[in-house]
Amino acid sequence: MKAVILAGGQGKRLRPLTNDMPKPLVEVAGKPIIVHQIEWLKKYGIREFIVTVGYLKEKFIDYLGSGRKYGAHISYIVEEEPLGTGGGLKNALSLLDKEEMFYVVNGDVITDIDPTKLIGMLDGSVIGAMATVPLPSPYGIVFSDSRDYIILFQEKPVIRDYWINAGLYLFKPEVFKYLPDRGDLERELFPKLADVRKLKTVKYYDFTIWRSIDTLKDLEEAEKIIFKEKISD
């Protein structure tokens, strides 16, 4: 099975690190985000990668090359102008239309969730599956009793009643009929698939790490988790 890594964005919120480096090549705990992703997916048998590139595209090709040094094969789809994640994925049609199904990963996600759990969702007319994770609160929570005495502090808990897009998807090639020439998956594709009941989710409750690297704070938090895991190992 193949995996597409969506890496064409500019990563503006991660500046100044992305002034001269595309976000997926920014290092987290000693290696680029995209290398974390390749190593993660390889653990589940994925060796064929398609990277959609645009901003500073030559940096990807220079750093990753053919993928041989990672025990993988990497192809590149170049966006000559920004197309968004939906348009970027549509550009990869010629490399994916013969596949039974394929993974798609946002280029700024670091995680260890099991992608194979999505496979069972593509049954019948369903053509897309989305990984979701519990919403992490950006703030600490304060609890009080009936007389307004504070009784407990909980630092940035996970809110399990609400779920967010984890940036990992599995699609059948039929999805290309719904993809825009320009635009994002979140705005242009997913609402369409949801309206016709062709999109399902797997809710991931237990994992060591899931982090979307949008800001310097996200990067710092991801590094803390990764280094903590290395120490515990």
Model-derived regions: residue spans:
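A structural signal for short hydrophobic beta-strand segments in well-ordered beta-sheet cores
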Residues: 25, 141-144, 201
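N-terminal nucleotide-binding beta1-loop-alpha1 segment
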Residues: 1-19, 42-44, 198
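Conserved N-terminal catalytic core of the sugar/cofactor nucleotidyltransferase
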Residues: 2-5, 31-106, 117, 178-181, ...
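Conserved donor-nucleotide/metal-binding helix-loop-beta segment in metal-dependent transferases, i.e.
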Residues: 113-139
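Short catalytic helix/loop segments, enriched in acidic residues and glycine
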Residues: 20-35
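Active-site metal-binding loops of divalent metal-dependent hydrolases
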Residues: 10, 107-109
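Short beta->alpha linker loops
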Residues: 29, 55, 80, 113, ...
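Catalytic-core segments of class I nucleotidyltransferases/pyrophosphorylases
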Residues: 46, 103, 110, 119-120, ...
